[in-house]
Every structure is written in C-alpha cells, then in structure tokens.
C-alpha cells in the first residue's frame, strides 16, 4: 500500500510540474546594443543576451551579435517589419521562452521599446524589461570631442512615422532656441535632400560659420568623422548610417 501511494504521489508531482511548465510565461528584454562595436555594448545588455534563448531583431542588428552569442535561436526581419518583430517576440514569450529584442543604440530612443510596450498591453502576462544602450548621439559626440556639453535637441529626419511639416517645425524651433542639434537618419535614397533642407532652415537663425560635425558608422568598421561649417554641411552627402551635429552660438 505504501509503495502504491508513493508511486501515486510521484506521478501527481510529475503532472503538477508539467502543468507548471506549460503555464510558464516568458520574458522579453528590449536591448539597446549601442553603436555597434562589442566594446560599446553595456554589461547589462550583454548579461540580458546571455540569459535569453531567442534573439529577435532587424537583420543587420542580429548580424552584429551572432558570432558572440552563437547558441541562441535567431529570428530576423527586414526593415519596416517592426510590428511583425514585436508579434514574434510576444509569441516566443508566450511559449515560456526568454526573448531578447535587439535594437541599435538605445531601445528607448527611436528603438523598439515604445512599440513593444504598446503591443504588450495585449499580453499582460509577459514581463517586459528595457535594457539601455549607448545611443548614436553619445557615441558620435565622443568621437568628435564634446559637442553636447549643454542643452541640445535630438531630431530624426525620417518622415516614415512623422510628417515632414512637423519635423520642419521642430528644426526651426530648436534653431531659434539656439540648441545644439543632433540629427538622426539624415538621408536615404528617397530623402536625399532632407539634410540640405534642414540646414537651410537652421541658416535662417544661425551663422554659416557655425561649427558642425558628422560621424558615419559610429563604433563600427569604417568609422569616419568630419568637422565643418554649417554652410559646408548643407552641400554634404551623407547616408542613414551617419549622425550629424550642428553647433550653436
């Protein structure tokens, strides 16, 4: 009788453990990888990636860490698939897995954190944790010297989510208020003249000799930095991997 009872208890414990495992809900880390170099990834970001079983992100960003974390399951999507990536992260977490959603720079600055929290309202069981990273504004500033010593404004020239009219208003407002301005996403194939337009707005309030700078591929292979005037910057060709700095009076 004692043996039978012991076997029944053992079976009950096994069933209980299986139910607990089936009901386990995972966690999503939203991780800022920094500008790109391994040395610029924070210890907290590295630790969160070590804890994660699944890594999700834009193809370029997952490619930056595959070699360092080869034992993870990787799920990648091309650009403009942000909602799909969030859905993938939540689906994996609902299976009980620990997930890392990776972004360049800082996840809360033009990253995935906001969208994940918005979509996370439909998954109240899933725990979200934002892991901060070094954003391009900081990384590029360190390359140039110290352009962000006082008040400054960070503005993205991408009009995918923000109408250009609103971006123009923000540029003019920052220039009129004499902020140092840091520009993200200054150009692309479809927005080749956006930096020139931004400089023209700023020239209405600032001198053509205003000191400016830009850094391409911050913290990555082929990093390139230049210091020039605002009038020179207006006619400079840059790309989406460039961060631009415009000084003040």
Where are these regions (language model features)?
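Cationic, low-complexity basic patches in intrinsically disordered or flexible, solvent-exposed regions
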Residues: 9-10
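Class I SAM-dependent methyltransferase SAM-binding "motif I" and its flanking Rossmann-like core
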Residues: 109-177
């Amino acid at each position: 009788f004692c043996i039978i009872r012991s076997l029944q208890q053992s079976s009950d414990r096994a069933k209980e453990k299986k139910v607990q495992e089936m009901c386990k809900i995972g966690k999503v880390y939203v991780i800022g990888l920094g500008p790109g170099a391994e040395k610029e990834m924070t210890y907290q970001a590295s630790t969160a990636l070590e804890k994660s079983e699944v890594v999700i992100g834009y193809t370029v960003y997952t490619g930056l860490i595959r070699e360092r974390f080869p034992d993870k399951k990787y799920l990648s999507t091309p650009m403009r698939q942000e909602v799909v990536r969030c859905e993938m992260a939540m689906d994996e977490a609902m299976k009980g897995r620990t997930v890392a959603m990776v972004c360049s720079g800082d996840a809360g600055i033009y990253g995935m954190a906001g969208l994940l929290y918005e979509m996370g309202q439909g998954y109240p069981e899933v725990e979200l944790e934002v892991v901060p990273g070094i954003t391009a504004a900081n990384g590029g500033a360190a390359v140039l010297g110290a352009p962000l010593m006082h008040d400054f404004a960070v503005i993205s020239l991408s009009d995918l989510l923000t109408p250009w009219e609103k971006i123009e208003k923000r540029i003019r407002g920052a220039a009129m208020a004499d902020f140092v301005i840091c520009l993200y996403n200054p150009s692309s194939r479809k927005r080749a003249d956006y930096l020139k337009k931004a400089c023209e707005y700023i020239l209405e309030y600032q001198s053509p000799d205003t000191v400016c700078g830009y850094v391409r591929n911050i913290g990555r292979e082929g990093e390139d930095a230049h210091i020039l005037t605002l009038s020179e910057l207006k006619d400079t060709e840059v790309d989406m991997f460039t961060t631009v700095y415009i000084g003040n009076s």
